[in-house]
From Swiss-Prot:
PANTHER family: CYTOCHROME C OXIDASE ASSEMBLY PROTEIN COX18, MITOCHONDRIAL, OXA1. The chain crosses the membrane at residues 1-21, 341-361, 367-387, 437-457, 468-488, 515-535. Its main location: membrane. This is Membrane protein insertase YidC.
Length: 560
């Protein structure tokens, strides 16, 4: 029966690793994006003179009619002067042609740990990469649906900055056409990654005005610049949406390649997800919108929505708005903004285990202030929770070690007659009250916790560039010197020495290979995950040594 234990452990190891690889196949990107050399060396902030994005491409502006094709628009001259806005957490550039956000930096999140002055760039439309947030007014009289192209807005300043002591910053872009005055207003708040984008329509044309507000995210097919170099760290890169009838629906690039999505929904949100960061358009909850995904003529992927018809009588004024979130996947903040938006922190199919783990880990961190020590304390708590199961397992192993001479005698007696050997072993186990599979139970129970913690460490932006101590400066990437994986392999070897030797030579060889196999797998795993496994193994060794010695002492005492 001991062969079952060996096979089970080996199968769990293989299945766990295959699941990680499968996760990458399903949600990861095969190649990382080609980085713009100039962008990698620029100083922090948004550079001057970056060309504005394409304003007149037909695929940029959706049709207000859910049954029709995207509107065909003629291009107009591109804007050369971007409007720059800076708050304490955002640095962005707005193209006056259409009022799209074509660049966006996150100064609180450095692109690389060794260059803290260079912020991570979420949006970019000036080089080899395309990722931007677009919005406008389409429909019967919408200025973004004109044959001459999208509107050219004017701003009072070329740059805006949230001053010290200022809690809110408002940036107004103005445009007039045929007696209708438009103000596209961007409202920013201190310390917040969400902003309000509103349209104030003043109809002085003498005729009724009607149109629709649209908002969308456009991205090319390049890889995820926020993913790390550790094995198994490529998370989902693609679109997602939420509706009351279908909460949290992923729409991958492959899905968009197969055909666009078009649905009538109420409220909800549309988003683009990547490792650690998310961008989402959130319309008014009461609006009935047409959500659409499609691919434009340049091969860019688009997810967005078109709102209901807006009617403005002659001489009347109307305001319509939407919220844009562009920043880190901070669960507490996302949950406040819109129902289901926190699900963009994708913990996989074990989310119901991962979410409580993160909640507990976050509370531990609030006391300790270090994510590495928080992982260690979390491991101790999890180990304490599983102690009754572990103790039963170690008692079973200790009894197995005690009957090892009897098992060897059975092997000598029955030789190659495996059927009689198995029957004799079962009788011996029954007599000695030993469960031969008892040692597997903690592994079975802890494996879902291990995988859930893997996704917590992988998906939680709080782990990004989080140091522990000494050479571990980032728990979300691999150990740069492979010290933790080697320690983990050593602890597995020690733990193996405490276990009874399998009676079959082939089983024994397989078990001896397990520390080497696991060490190889863990060389490229996130350091935080390896830290958890090292601490878990050390605690297991201590528990097993203590229980084994107690049982051996009791056995000797009974024999005396």
């Amino acid at each position: 029966m001991d062969i079952k234990r060996t096979i089970l452990i080996a199968a769990l190891a293989v299945v766990s690793y295959v699941m990680v690889l499968k996760w990458n196949d399903d949600y990861g990107q095969a190649a990382l994006p080609t980085q713009n050399t100039a962008a990698s060396t620029v100083a922090p902030g948004l550079p001057d003179g970056v060309p504005a994005g394409n304003n007149g491409a037909s695929a940029d502006v959706p049709s207000a009619n859910a049954e029709s094709s995207p509107a065909e628009l003629a291009p107009v001259a591109l804007s050369k002067d971007l409007i720059r806005v800076k708050t304490d957490v955002l640095e962005l550039a707005i193209d006056p042609v259409g009022g799209d956000i074509v660049q966006l930096n996150l100064p609180k999140y450095p692109r690389r740990q060794d260059h803290p002055d260079i912020p991570f760039q979420l949006f970019d439309n000036g080089g080899e990469r395309v990722y931007l947030a677009q919005s406008g007014l389409t429909g019967a009289n919408g200025p973004d649906a004109r044959a001459s192209g999208r509107p050219l807005y004017a701003a009072e300043q070329k740059s805006y900055q949230l001053a010290d002591g200022q809690e809110q910053l408002v940036v107004d872009l103005k445009f007039s056409d045929n007696g209708v005055n438009y103000i596209k207003r961007f409202s920013f708040k201190r310390g917040e990654y969400d902003l309000n984008v509103s349209y104030l329509i003043d109809n002085q044309s003498g005729q009724a005005w009607s149109g629709n507000m649209f908002a969308q995210l456009k991205r090319d097919a390049s890889g995820d610049p926020s993913s790390s170099t550790a094995t198994g760290t490529a998370t989902y890169l693609g679109a997602a949406l939420w509706t009351a009838s279908e909460p949290y629906k992923k729409v991958s690039m492959k899905d968009i390649d197969k055909g666009g999505l078009k649905e009538n929904v109420s409220g909800g949100w549309v988003a683009w997800l990547q490792h650690y960061f998310v961008t989402a358009w959130i319309p008014a909850k009461s609006d009935n919108n047409v959500v659409q995904t499609r691919k434009d003529s340049q091969g860019n992927y688009i997810i967005g929505y078109t709102g209901p018809v807006i009617s403005v009588p002659a001489g009347g004024k109307v305001e319509t708005s939407a919220m844009l979130y562009a920043g880190p996947k901070i669960q507490s903040k996302l949950k406040e903004l819109s129902p289901g938006l926190e699900l963009t922190v994708d913990y996989g199919f074990l989310w119901f285990i991962a979410q409580p783990i993160f909640w507990l880990l976050q509370h531990i961190h609030s006391l300790l202030g270090n994510w590495g020590w928080s992982i260690i304390v979390l491991t101790m708590l999890i180990k304490g929770l599983f102690f009754p199961l572990s103790a039963a397992s170690y008692r079973s192993m200790a009894r197995m070690r005690a009957v090892a001479p009897k098992l060897a005698a059975l092997k000598e007696r029955f030789g190659d007659d495996r059927q009689k050997m198995s029957q004799a072993m079962m009788e011996l186990y029954k007599k000695e009250k030993i469960n031969p599979l008892g040692g597997c139970l903690p592994i079975l129970v802890q494996m879902p916790v291990f995988l859930a913690l893997y996704w917590v460490l992988l998906e939680s932006v709080e782990m990004r560039q989080a140091p522990w101590m000494l050479w571990i400066t980032d728990l979300s990437i691999k150990d740069p010197f492979f010290i933790l994986p080697i320690i983990m392999g050593a602890t597995m070897f020690i733990q193996q020495r405490l276990n009874p030797t399998p009676p079959d030579p082939m089983q024994a060889k397989v078990m001896k290979m397990m520390p080497i196999i696991f060490t190889f797998f863990f060389l490229w795993f996130p350091a935080g995950l390896v830290l958890y496994w090292v601490v878990n193994n050390c605690l297991s060794i201590s528990q097993q040594w203590y229980i084994t010695r107690r049982i051996e002492a009791a056995t000797k005492k009974a024999a005396a």
